[in-house]
Each structure stands twice: as structure tokens, then as C-alpha cells.
Amino acid sequence: MELQVTNNFSDITSEILALAKMSEQAGSIAPELYTQYDVKRGLRDLNGKGVLAGLTNISDVRATKIVNGEAVPAHGQLFYRGYNVEDLVRGFSKDNRFGFDEVTYLLLFNKLPNKEELESFSRLLNSYRSLPTSFVRDIIMKAPSKDMMNTLARSVLTLYSYDDRADDVSLPNVLRQCLQLISLCPMLSIYGYQAYSHYHDGNSLYIHQPSQTLSMAENILHILRPDSSYTPLEAKILDIALILHMEHGGGNNSSFTTRVVTSSLSDTYSVCLLYTS
């Protein structure tokens, strides 16, 4: 079912086309000037390598090795806080448990939690897995977008209005906000998808509440599926996929932009909006 557009809000007129051409001409810069002034375009040097823009010990991606003084492709390795992710996955897979909460703890606090710390942290994340009253109806279901990243960004930014301490950038408050967003973003994404599927594709609408006893991966599948069904293998594979996408060195566009905006003491929701865009 397509949403009806009742105005010319999206029209690109001949006047706009003419102005766009003028704007393009007015904003052009001769390519040779980038070389003359040693300007790094797209965070890349002239040799194609990345530009050093900061330091981090959170994660590291190794995709090359040095052979005869030259960097050549190698079997990729991903490290979180010095731990090879393959070793982390092997550890909790051997014990037949989910690793999302444990690796989240590691990335945030630079240590692997013991059993008591992990159980307490998991309970905290579960307690944050609840959206404000009528948020799904009033925010997500109204004017649903065809673009899932747009839906997620809009929902995250709207949470600002529900937070009495939205502009408090003290460490305890920012940590609280970030942990809440970690718990809520999967829900925002799935509910946004359900709205899209219903209003744009004409499918039946299913809205399931998360469970306080399921892992992150299990909850995603539980909320996503019409009948909430999933296999243990599906949940384990999704858990690993979530872990692999947690961090990637901090050098991509969204991470770099987030670090720049965070340094200006922007609120957490606006920073997260940039990361989800």
C-alpha cells in the first residue's frame, strides 16, 4: 500500500535544475590544487592509504602484511581490545553461550567480565529494552520511510524528546544513554521494517514485545518473525554477525564523523544519528 502524496513537496522544477547547475559551477575546485596544498581527499593519501586521524586501542583491522617492503593482501584479522575476535567467538561457542553482551562489555570497559559482572551487565541491558509509551504508534508507524537507515535515524533523534537529561554530557549519563541505545536500536530497526512492510508492501503488521530472558540475537529474531520462531543455529549465527559488526578500527566515515561531533560536546542522540545515517 503506497502512501498518498498530496502536494508537490518532492518536485524538481526547471528552476531548481538551473540553480543546481549554477551551484555546481560555483563550487568546483581545480583537482591540481589538492596536490598543490597536500589536501587529503576522503581521508586517503595520494598513495591510497588511510590518513592517520587519531589513536585507538578499541579495535584493529589487519588486512595486509609486509612482503619485501610492500603491503600485500592477507587473511583478514579483527581485534577487539587486543583480543583476536576469532578467539573470542571460539571461547563462547565452545561453552554454548551467546557472546554479544560479553563483547559489548569488553569494548566499553577494556576487560572481559567475570560471571557475576556479565550477569549484572546483561540484566542492565535487558532492563533498558523498553521504548517510551506509545512510541511505536506515534513515531514509527506515522509517515514510515522506505529507507531503513532513515527510519532508524529519525527514531533515535526523537528519543531526545523523551529524555529529561538529553543534554547532560557527563560520563555516567552518556554511558546510560549509550547502553539504552544499544538495547533499543534493534527494536527501532525491526519496528521500522514492520511499518515499511505493512504500509508500503501491504503485508500484515506484527509487533512483538521483547523478552527479558532472551539474548540480543534471540530477541531480534523473536521480534522480527511473524510467529517469533527461530532455530538455535540462526540465533548463534546472528550473535556472531552482530559481534563482527560492532567495531572496525574507527576509521570509516561514520566513526570519524562521530568522533569529530562528539568533541564538540553534542548530545548523545545527535551523535548516534550521524552514526546511523
Report each predicted region and the residues it spans.
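Conserved small/polar residues in nucleotide/adenosyl-binding loops
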Residues: 275-276
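An N-terminal structural lobe/cap that precedes and organizes the functional/catalytic core
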Residues: 14-21, 25-135
